[in-house]
Amino acid sequence: MASILQAIRYSHGKLAIIDQLQLPYVEKFITIRTSEDAWHAIKEMRVRGAPAIAIVAALALASELNTLIIHDKLSSRAEEVKLFIREKLDYLVSSRPTAVNLSDAARKLESTISGHADTPGATGRTVAEAFIRAAEEMMTKDLDDNMKIGQNGAEWIIKHALARHKSTATVLTHCNTGSLATSGYGTALGVIRSLASKKALEHAYCTETRPYNQGSRLTAFELVHDRLPATLITDSMVAALLASTKAEVDAIVVGADRVAANGDTANKIGTYGLAVLAKYHGVKFLVAAPLTTIDLGTKSGEDIVIEERPSAEVTKIRGPVDGDHPADIVKLETVHIAAKGIDVWNPAFDVTPSTLIDGIITEVGVIEKEADGQFHLERLFIDNSAS
């Protein structure tokens, strides 16, 4: 397996992200200097993936604060800087409301700086520096959590999903949950990477993931980058794949943008359909997500707000012009692929009921349903003193 792709670059208050709208054709990094830059990058999906947008939002504000410190433009009053940070965090959260990681990160960062601002002798600079440290630690922790998620998921699949005659797993994944969606390594794609590192990966399948094609553009890009045995399929081919005795898919592993208290999971549109197919074909269906994605304040999937995206994402598609051109020059064009005038419904996510989920892979282990047939996710936070 080749080196893991790095999509977020941060050092000493300077942040750059790979522009995912250009992938897989052009690997271009864009500089993020302010919270406004981050808001637009998230809204325009230049960066996406629940963990990644939380990290980019936090580091963008850290970069902005660092610049204000360097140029001596930061208020000396702790209370004013606290309010400035709070307003910026609220603004950043509005860029992608479905992803709980973003609001969770904002809440934790706000708590950190509020506590610091209330300490004797606090100044505007010390409050800003406390925020910067917390944002940087968030990125480090996310990468560590992803490695643990990958390890836990791989071990569970080897133990519970493989038929007796098999020693390697064939896994299907949806959307993009790798280095491009996190600080690095990934959640669901991290599980596939961990299987490969254990020499326990037979094959990986990734769905195209219409309408935004995160699977064909991004996951396929990562799988090729890592030189993993993989095949791209369209979303409508999944049923045929699971029915195929030749493919022998052992597990479907997906990520999550929000997991409700009862285990209902909001993820990229199409996930619900995969879970239904997995249940029918007897294939294990797993959700891979850090504890920060679990929202105990949301009782069930019925309470999750589903973001709706522009109709143009369904009726148009963007890609390079076919033909001869220098390797370093790629001309991207947008073309219509639907009849003009047709109405479009474009929800970005759907909700998979917990009844269809076999396990939720986290950094502290794989959570399964208990004797009553229910997930009891609240116990995770009691056992791990998380909030």
UniProtKB/Swiss-Prot annotation:
Q: Which residues form a coiled coil?
A: none
By its UniProt entry, which InterPro entries does this protein fall under? IF-2B-related, IF-M1Pi, IF_2B-like_C, Initiation_fac_2B_a/b/d, M1Pi_N, NagB/RpiA_transferase-like
Q: What is its main location?
A: cytoplasm
Q: Domain of life, per the record?
A: Eukaryota
Q: Could you name the active-site residues?
A: D257 (proton donor)
Q: Name one GO cellular component term.
A: nucleus
Q: Does the keyword Isomerase apply?
A: yes
Q: Which GO terms describe its biological process?
A: L-methionine salvage from methylthioadenosine
Task: Tell me where in or outside the cell this protein is found.
Answer: Cytoplasm; Nucleus
Q: Give a short account of what the protein does.
A: Catalyzes the interconversion of methylthioribose-1-phosphate (MTR-1-P) into methylthioribulose-1-phosphate (MTRu-1-P).
Name the record gives this protein = Methylthioribose-1-phosphate isomerase
Q: What is the lineage of its organism?
A: Eukaryota, Fungi, Dikarya, Ascomycota, Pezizomycotina
